[in-house]
Amino acid sequence: MRKFYSFAIIISLLVTGLFIHTPKAEAAGYNYGEALQKAIMFYEFQRSGKLPENKRDNWRGDSGLNDGADVGLDLTGGWYDAGDHVKFNLPMAYSQTMLAWAAYEAEEALERSGQMGYLLDAIKWVSDYLIKCHPSPNVFYYQVGDGHLDHSWWGPAEVMQMDRPAYKVDLANPGSTVVAEAAAALASAAVVFADRDPAYAATCIQHAKELYNFAEITKSDSGYTAASGFYDSHSGFYDELSWAGVWLYLATGDETYLNKAEQYVAYWGTEPQTNIISYKWAHCWDDVHYGACLLLAKITGKQIYKEAIERHLDYWSVGYNGERVHYTPKGLAWLDSWGSLRYATTTAFLASVYADWEGCSREKAAIYNDFAKQQIDYALGSSGRSYVVGFGVNPPKRPHHRTAHSSWADSMSVPDYHRHVLIGALVGGPGKDDSYTDDINNYINNEVACDYNAGFVGALAKMYEDYGGSPIPDLNAFEEITNDEFFVMAGINASGQNFIEIKALLHNQSGWPARVADKLSFRYFVDLTELIEAGYSASDVTITTNYNAGAKVTGLHPWNEAENIYYVNVDFTGTKIYPGGQSAYRKEVQFRIAAPQNTNFWNNDNDYSFRDIKGVTSGNTVKTVYIPVYDDGVLVFGVEPEGGSGENNSSISITNATFDKNPAKQENIQVVMNLNGNTLNGIKYGNTYLREGTDYTVSGDTVTILKSFLNSFDTSTVQLIFDFSAGRDPVLTVNIIDTTTSASIVPTTADFDKNPDASRDVKVKLVPNGNTLLAVKKDGEALVLGRDYSIDGDEVTIFREYLADQPVGRVTLTFDFDRGTDPVLTINITDSRQVETGVIQIQMFNGNTSDKTNGIMPRYRLTNTGTTPIRLSDVKIRYYYTIDGEKDQNFWCDWSSVGSNNITGTFVKMAEPKEGADYYLETGFTDGAGYLQPNQSIEVQNRFSKADWTDYIQTNDYSFSTNTSYGSNDRITVYISGVLVSGIEP
């Protein structure tokens, strides 16, 4: 990908030496590789249109295939917006641009993680659609679907039946905001495809140029009306004109677009009663001037853009001009109730991008990187729960999402669980006090959206770039089918000595994927032996209907005449039955089977289909496998009686099965055949016949598909065709899953001292869980067995000679197993020979100087005034105070230039209370904090409170100071290796 920077900036950076940034020392905290791949996978579940054959799930299907038909165009494709099914092109185009920005800024990380291909697929899925929406230079279709109609129905995308009108803007009815955002999206797509598919990139550029011109010559949103109340443009269109101009410059190198981008800066919003560019909101679908500002800073190096973006990032991190965005007690930078995590994680992405730019100072880079990690870790679980579906501890299980819920009843309460896991979806997030309810009705905190994940993906890519992680091999969403998709529930309406009347409801509760069926039928089987023995025949039996919701009821039809078995055929062909509401997912029919009048030999007890419904009366019904269901003549539910004739079709007892590759759960799959007079020629996978005796066995009417054969497949959906000598060939669909427990190691962190007097081999115990260790790797390169490490049973020894060759810092070793997620060993490498006790100076102030407060906020600045480095893990700082009412207490590090995750806080109750002190807070540092170099300073901003938020009285505390900026305080004590080096103890 091409990146453009001004010549002046490059020269300046070369002169100042700012190209080198210190590596980040914090611990990884979470598996960013897994989080990244899942966040990208989410977009596959949002796809509209004809889905590709290589899709990685079994619960999404084709949908929205008539989009655009009302205007004579093909407007299929794109993404559904959130938990609904409208295609709003403003947030969609924004989201695609953000994904392209991630590809632009974190290309190496995405390639290394194996996720670039999936990300490019997501980008192109939208850019292809946006091109369709632009049929001529000054016409753009900006929305498909009516938000009000769409929101009035709750069901899966595959079966929606409402009108889906297409809405456009043109010269007479313009929409500069959405058109310019589409231009940005296509220009950004051109940037990432420039070297991969130049022809496609050229197509994107052509459309982007035309769209930009269209937006620029109209400069109006008067025609952008259909999204009103859903995605209004509050910030206007000038921010989009700058944003799109920047991306067109990056795509083309044409400075005309860069000049245009800068020209529109004067029209960006400002803070009230000032001329300062707005900095207190966040980059989002509505306001993209923050991203434009950041890119302009990187491209031009101009101070106006640097100051503006730093003002914004400061406001979100350490505060600007005495103000900071609200922080929840557990550390989320919280802007707004609707999608709070969307704003925090997107700002985290911007912070990471800017921090990694050479024009950002070391001090600012440390602040912004620390902020970014804190916010991403919050989303992944640092508050005690994950906010990403399918990831981490206690993730959301009930997101506000129609297709993932997969209701058949047009109801958020049916079923009372989600049938599908919406892997990777970032939910809206908590309230300003960390409160959150995982409830399907909670669309404020628990809905998901394409724009929620957009900045999140980029931020995760930057986390993976810095801290690594282990993507799950062959991640997929092939789920086990957990309920019957088609079935009949039946009962007895009435019965007499010569008749029975059946009430039957044919159900479609399909979900893997949901689908509209208009060729469903079922059969009710009867035994006419008693009638025939009385001298009658099947032709003497009459079939009538009482209530009928669209079926053609015929019969009796012969099934096995030798055994007097016949059936009533109830055929709903032409009637749509689909999981879309009470009247849609089930159709009722009431039919009567009657022998001649005045006869009394009718016997229900010997009828095949009567088995489960005997005694089921008074309008009640039960599900029964003895009333089999067919889709276009193919058995999809139930069991047929033996000896069938008619169409001479064979059947199998199950048509769906699940095979688990987990060695502890692998089982053969047994299928019972109803041959119906046919013979089994063989079983086919595609056009290839399985090998009898090797892949499967046959014993009588039972076929056993062997686990050795099934285990040869990767996780996927496999269809096995039972090839019979006559009739239709039934298909067994096997969902191949893998719940194998990944291997683990003990420990996952270790220390190594390069000092020869202290160095030791690092020993690791393997917990294979049935997996096999293939290699130990560092940065993708395998260590040499026997030279770098050894294996003895389940113990791996990393040789000290290998570790002694590694630099001081953090080394990450990946244990590469044949299955599951690979565990990682992090080794903190130090060299005690380099460490001598240094001279340290501490300055502090209180972030809160109120007499009474529920939160004490000591801020420290440590400076090494000596000539040798100080290992920070040897340093302890004590702040003395009175607790004023014994309670549990909580500690937070709001920010530190060495990373808040590298700061520890311990509350110590003093054995002998002193005046002004019965407790102290001891602040320490982890190994990841590294060293404090001579003449270097670091900052630590702490905060602590009682668990019940009752007040402290600060004025009588030993260490309390009224300083509001850094100054001396000899009542703060500092220790190095347990030795007091600064301050006076009480």
Swiss-Prot record:
Catalytic reaction annotation: Endohydrolysis of (1->4)-beta-D-glucosidic linkages in cellulose, lichenin and cereal beta-D-glucans
A GO term for molecular function: cellulose binding
Gene that produces this protein: celZ
Domain B' repeats: 744-831
Tagged with keyword Repeat: yes
SMART domains cross-referenced by the UniProt entry: CBM_3
Keyword Oxidoreductase: no
Pfam families documented for this protein: CBM_3, CBM_X2, Glyco_hydro_9
Record-annotated CBM3 domain positions: 481-642, 836-986
Family matches, as SUPFAM superfamilies: Carbohydrate-binding domain, E set domains, Six-hairpin glycosidases
Active site per the UniProt annotation: D84, H400, D438, E447
Name by which UniProt lists this protein: Endoglucanase Z
UniProt Domain B repeat ranges: 651-738
Record's keyword terms, sorted: Carbohydrate metabolism, Cellulose degradation, Glycosidase, Hydrolase, Polysaccharide degradation, Repeat, Signal
Top-level taxon of the source organism: Bacteria
Enzyme class: hydrolase
Originating species: Thermoclostridium stercorarium
Residues making up the signal peptide according to the UniProt record: 1-25
EC number: 3.2.1.4
Membrane-spanning segments: none
Gene Ontology BP terms: cellulose catabolic process
Family: Belongs to the glycosyl hydrolase 9 (cellulase E) family.
